[in-house]
Amino acid sequence: MSTSITVRNRDRSLPPLLLPNVSLLEKDIRRKGTQNVGITDPELLSTTWTRKRAFPTDELLGGYKRLKPAAADSNECAIGIATVTPPPTLPVSAIVPPPQNYTPPLFEYHPHALASMVNEDANASCTQMSIISRSTSNSTTSSATSTSSISKRQRSGPSCDKCRLKKIKCNAKIEILLQDDTIMPMISNKLRYVLTPDDIRLYRGTLLRNIAIPDDVIEGTGSRKLIKHIDKLVLLTPCLPCIKKKHSSSSTNFPKNDKCTFSKGFTRADINISSKISLKFKDKTIYDITYDDYKSIDF
């Protein structure tokens, strides 16, 4: 256990803040004895202590440690080993007070508010991402649903009689070239009439003047037909099953030359009219109904 040793400088010939060099004191003790030395403490006068407690010059110069100041004596003031000069301070008169109207700025730091703002930004971004992902999934689901519904549905309009009977998809193409009530009594008295090449040449300068009709229809060499149905002229392209004759010819209610037939009409309005006609004229088909029969029905 180390003990502190109080060192007092009683040699008045030395400067007040300097201590005697211990190594020099040891040489003087060997040469002259214990006289003429400014150390009066018996412990310091012993040669054994100086040998044991003497510090090398390198240690004194390199790793210098400040000793504790000696305690105050009853008769004289203790002289400290070292004193620290405090930094100069401004006089009281040099401090200028702030003006009366001066208001210091307030800088308030609210960690909870900052955390809440960060949380709100994170929640907003998460909400936006969830909305985007939800809208994307909804659009994907709706597109998939619409695609599946379109693929499952046979066609946008009615199917031909044979495809409806076989419950297969009908790819017949229906083009309405002209629709007007004035054409109902024209060309033929029948509500359903298939125009021949002679009929097309006859009405090409009047009724069919502004209608583009394909050459194969005019010449009668193709499978497409120009049909008058109630108040419209329809260009019908037969479906592929009817063209390939994959259906059986068990049905004898329709003419043999009309392979792809639409007995109930080509539009949904035609189906409504056909259902009313069939209720009143049960023994007639759409090919037998005349314009007079049509006028006798109250639509």
Swiss-Prot record:
Region described as Disordered: spans on this chain: 133-160
Family annotation (InterPro entries): Zn2-C6_fun-type_DNA-bd_sf, Zn2Cys6_DnaBD
GO cellular component, one term: nucleus
Keyword Transcription regulation attached: yes
Localisation: Cytoplasm; Nucleus
Record keywords: Cytoplasm, Nucleus, Transcription, Transcription regulation
Biological processes per GO annotation: cellular response to starvation; negative regulation of filamentous growth of a population of unicellular organisms; negative regulation of transcription by RNA polymerase II; positive regulation of induction of conjugation with cellular fusion; positive regulation of sterol import; positive regulation of transcription by RNA polymerase II
Family matches, as SUPFAM superfamilies: Zn2/Cys6 DNA-binding domain (SSF57701)
Single Gene Ontology MF annotation: RNA polymerase II-specific DNA-binding transcription factor binding
Phenotype seen when the gene is deleted: Leads to increased expression of NCE102 and PRR2, when SUT2 is also deleted.
Comp. bias regions, Low complexity: 133-151
Biological function: Transcription factor involved in the induction of hypoxic gene transcription when the cells are shifted from aerobiosis to anaerobiosis. Promotes exogenous sterol uptake and stimulates endogenous sterol biosynthesis. With SUT2, positively regulates mating by repressing the expression of the mating inhibitors NCE102, PRR2 and RHO5 in response to pheromone. Finally, regulates filamentation via the repression of genes such as GAT2, HAP4, MGA1, MSN4, NCE102, PRR2, RHO3, and RHO5, when nutrients are plentifu.
Family: Belongs to the SUT1 family.
Additional information: Present with 1100 molecules/cell in log phase SD medium.
Quaternary structure annotation from Swiss-Prot or TrEMBL: Interacts with SSN6/CYC8.
Name under which the protein is recorded: Sterol uptake protein 1
Organism: Saccharomyces cerevisiae (strain ATCC 204508 / S288c) (Baker's yeast)
